[in-house]
Each structure stands twice: as structure tokens, then as C-alpha cells.
């Protein structure tokens, strides 16, 4: 079954012939290779490009590596990258004329000196270069510097709920329940049956993500790293930092792990796109607060598999889904903080902080969003909108609930919508 990824395909099509290296990043198995080597490849063919002018090469494919005299097993044994000279010789053998050639290169981070190789291809007028990569440290964080302003990133996520519903055989209510449980990794979505989906997710975690992270970063104490993943999985959407996590290890695991080691492991997880962090932002002071942060999983199915599907908290899971959707749509997402001073019943002034779940920015557009699993009564609604009423600016304020409600604005101009409309209609918060 073909899964439509039009949102990302359109991004690639618009970037053709722009003189930049198109870099598709994202967690492994989110669909980058399928997007590049199937959907985009067939777009090129359907638009008159000859197959011999499309050069596809996957650096994690034993068959492709054989073509250039390399061995995947040997590379992994020796813990080294792929010889760039052998690869460039292969490309030269494929370029037979001055016509436009499209290079579709998969898992580019496995190639030694890939930055220099790609920059070299950019100097050729007849090459349009598209690559994928699964390591943020090698790609996302360095695109601007390594490619001297000539890198153009398209970050890809697992299936959004809207993409998921295109292949799900059921209504949106049951669909969201399954999506929040098993996530949107394409190969998992296409599996039949709960047991198969769960097994696939657990296998992905152990055989792909953990293995990649430990090998790439040469982690010696794999047990500590996995324990940290378990702690993060049990506390999605909770404020934390390396020092707090160190204390958790000390109390629960009787471990002497340092906060510096925990910080390093958190970086590894973010670099592999397994998790993302949201910083706190002082809305009144207009300044970022360095720590603590909130961490969200790029795929809820992976998070649930990590804790063996034992701890399914609808409130935090819904918050994670909303966060991922906002990031997929291109917003930067922070956690809003509003310092306030209030008098208690004895007249004593106390200082506290109100929280806005998400402060979303894209260019000059900003939204303040609260995730409220349910709004059973007016008391709960007032509680959810309380932080909004302390914000002095005119940016739109939105409450997203799982309750099936029609969109409405209250007397304060605050929009309430249901999560189904939010996830299935990308323009609903603009209306």
C-alpha cells in the first residue's frame, strides 16, 4: 500500500534546481528513503526525466556498496565511514553527457567527508543533489556552516494523524486512539494486529535506535543510557534537567551517574531525532529560561514501546501529539511561563508561575495553545484559560480539547477547538 506524503513531496518539488543541496533529515524509518527513492523518483520520471539521469545510491545498502567495492559488514566491523574516492568514481562513471542529473543519496552521513563531496557536486551546473540523513549532529546543526549557506533542509516526521487517516480503515475517533498508542512509523502503521505492531516497535527501538546511538557515540554503559530513556518515556511533557535526572538515578537506581553524562545522553537522543526538547519562555519578560526543559518523543508508538505499553496517560500523550503536529507544520515551539504575584487569604503576597503549554512561532505569527484533555465543566475551563488572561498581547489564544465540540470563541476572544479538527485541518487555528 502506498502512503501519500504530499506535504514533503511538494517541498522537494519546489526546491528543484535551486542551486542548493536538499537535505532530508528525520528519525530513522520515518519514510525519508521512501519519499526520495519512490515518491520523488517517480515524480521525476513522470515529468520527463530519463531514468539514466537519476542516480540513486543508498549508503546503508549492501548491494549499493558492492557497486563501489565496499562491504557494509566490513565498514561496521571497522567502525569507519565509506571511502569518498570510490563513491565519486562511481558517480563519474554514471554521468555520460551534459544533461541534468539528479543525485538521490540515502543516509549520506555514512560517507566520509560527505560535506566536501556534496559541495563539489554543487559546482557542477548539471547536477541537482538530494540527500537524506538520520543524524542531527552531522546534518541539521551543521548545514549552514558545512555547506556555506548552500544547504536546504527538509525535516521529516513520522506520519501525521492526517496522513495516518489516509490509510486507516476506521473513523477518526478510533483512529486517534490507535495513533496515540502505536504512533506513525510507516512500517508499523501498515502492520496488521496489535501484537505485530507492538513487536515491530520494540524491535525498532532495540535493533535500530539503541544500536545506532550506542555505536555512533561509542557508549560504554548502555544500561545507563537505556535507564534514562525509560525515565524520559515515563515522564513525557514533564519539566526536567540533567541535575533532576541525576537525583532520580541516585534515588531509584542507586547510580552515581553525573549530570554531565546525562546531558551527553540527552544530546545523543536529540541528535538521532528520537526526542525533541522545548525550552521555557518568559512571556512577560520576553526571555528564554535555560532550564528545566520538557522532552517529547518524535513518535508516541516508540515511547509506548519503550515502557512496554504499560503506562498510557491520555493527557500527556495528547500533549505530545499536539507538539509533534505543530513542529511538523513548521512552528518553533516553547513552553510559556508567566510570573505572577497574588495575595493569599491572609493578605500575604506569594509569587508563582502560570504555564502555557505551547508558545508557537513562525515568522511574525504567534499562537498560545493549551492542551486540555477534557473540559467537563466551567471550573476546568476557567482553570485552563487563566494563564491566557495574564498575557497582555493580542496574539491568538487557543484551547485544544479531546471533547467533541464545535469551534467557538468565548467572551475573552479565546478559541476552543477539538483535537480532531486541529489535527485534520491545518488551517483551523487560522480561522
Cite the ranges covered by each PLM segment.
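Interdomain hinge/linker elements that couple catalytic modules in large macromolecular machines
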Residues: 2, 157, 162-339, 351
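Hydrophobic positions on the alpha1 helix immediately C-terminal to the Walker A/P-loop
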Residues: 35, 39
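Short regulatory helix/loop adjacent to the ATP-binding pocket of P-loop NTPases
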Residues: 120, 137-153, 167-169
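A cross-kingdom feature that marks ATP-driven nucleic-acid transaction machinery
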Residues: 2, 25, 29, 33-34, ...
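Pre-Walker A adenine-sensing motif
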Residues: 1-19
